[in-house]
Each structure stands twice: as structure tokens, then as C-alpha cells.
A protein has these predicted regions:
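Short, small-residue-biased leader/transition segments that mark boundaries at the very start
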Residues: 1-8
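Loop-helix junctions at membrane interfaces
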Residues: 13-226
Length: 226
């Protein structure tokens, strides 16, 4: 139960002062990441809702040019895949739910944006380990690669998933679903290029300041020290 958990934590803190500090740091870090995730989710919502160029398509549907994915990928680079993915999922799903044109696509949006964040985070933090080096060229290269990986997934997955989603879940005719998928592919490709450029510029610009402010912790290993 929660009460027993709190008692256990207090016992650990009393008997092991060092663990108390680590426990508090971990809790503070989690709270900070959740707050930053909420901020990025808000940016996803605002950028998609108010900065998009909506393109009407047959059947009363629409696709759009937007930079909402920028903050999903940025979150994955700054906070990790799960946090970035959740920021994109929450922010852009709410945006879909608030728009009558996109409301039926909200479940698809939630899943795809979460996957964008997870893929970006996997490449950036599990493969490249960008938080274990201060090498600016290395970080720039892998932030670019990670952004491309996450957004390239979306370029491929969005029209394919959208095609089957609209045809089999929403019951749209195959011809209409096919046209929508082709239009979506073109718009998603343009969005991916713009978002990649923005993410790499923003991330590499703010990273040094965030490190100094202890909002990003870099654990430089001997192998990665420069």
C-alpha cells in the first residue's frame, strides 16, 4: 500500500543518508521531467492548432502542413523517448479532439506520436548515448540522425496506418482512403523535413544552456571525454 511504501522510504532515508539524497534527487528529476513534458505537450498543441496550414481533401477530411512533431522529437532528445512520445501523443491528440475535422483520427495520432518519440529516444539515448559526451559535433550528428529516424518512421507509417484506419475502422471507401493516404504522405514528408531542421537547430542551440542550468545532466565517461 502507499502507507507502507512511505514508511519503507522513511526507514531507508533514516538508516542510509546517502540513499536519501539519491531518492530525493530521483523524485525531483521525475517531477521536473513531467513538468517539462507538460510544457512540450502544450507546445505540440499550440503549434498544430494555430500554426498549421490545413489542406481540405475529398470526403470532408483534411491533411495539414504543421510543425507539431518538432516538439515531440525535441522532447525525446531532451528528456528521453517516453517523455517526448507522451508530449507528442498528449498534445496532438488533444488538438485532434478539439477539431471536428481530425477528431476521428485521435487514436491513430496518439499511437504514432508515441512511436516517434520512442524511436527518436532509442537512437539518441540508447544507441548514441548523447548524454554521455560533450562533443558538439557528435551530438549534432546523432541529434540529426535520431530526428530523421523518428520522423522517417512517421513518413512511412502515417499514410499506411491512415489508409487501413480510415478503410477498416472508419469505413471509408477504398478509393477515398487511397487518395487520403497519398495526400497525407506528401504533407507528412514536407512536415518531416521542416521539423528535422527546426529540431536540430533548437536542440543544439539550447543544450549548452540547459546543461549549465542542470536541466540536462551529462555523464561523460572516460571513453567519451574530449
Amino acid at each position: 500500500s502507499r502507507g507502507l511504501g512511505d514508511v519503507y522510504k522513511r526507514q531507508i532515508c533514516t538508516r542510509f543518508p546517502g540513499k536519501r539524497e539519491k531518492l530525493m534527487n530521483k523524485q525531483n528529476s521525475t517531477v521536473m521531467k513531467l513538468a517539462e513534458t507538460a510544457l512540450l505537450a502544450a507546445l505540440c498543441y499550440v503549434s498544430f492548432t494555430f500554426l498549421q496550414i490545413k489542406i481540405p481533401v475529398p470526403g470532408g477530411d483534411a491533411t495539414s502542413l504543421h510543425i507539431g512533431n518538432t516538439f515531440c522529437v525535441l522532447g525525446a532528445l531532451l528528456l528521453g523517448g517516453w517523455y517526448g512520445g507522451l508530449a507528442g501523443s498528449i498534445g496532438m491528440t488533444i488538438a485532434d479532439l478539439m477539431d471536428p475535422v481530425y477528431i476521428t483520427g485521435a487514436p491513430k495520432t496518439f499511437v504514432l506520436k508515441l512511436c516517434i518519440g520512442l524511436i527518436t529516444g532509442l537512437v539518441a539515448h540508447k544507441i548514441a548515448k548523447i548524454n554521455e559526451t560533450n562533443d558538439k559535433k557528435y551530438v549534432f550528428k546523432w541529434s540529426l540522425i535520431a530526428s530523421i529516424a523518428g520522423l522517417a518512421f512517421n513518413v512511412i507509417a502515417d499514410p499506411i496506418v491512415g489508409y487501413f484506419y480510415k478503410q477498416y475502422i472508419l469505413g471509408q471507401p477504398q478509393e477515398v482512403a487511397s487518395i487520403l493516404a497519398k495526400l497525407s504522405a506528401g504533407a507528412t514528408f514536407v512536415n518531416a523535413i521542416v521539423s528535422t531542421i527546426l529540431v536540430v537547430i533548437i536542440y543544439n542551440a539550447v543544450r549548452p544552456a540547459l546543461i549549465k542550468a542542470n536541466l540536462i545532466r551529462v555523464y561523460v565517461t572516460a571513453a567519451n571525454a574530449k
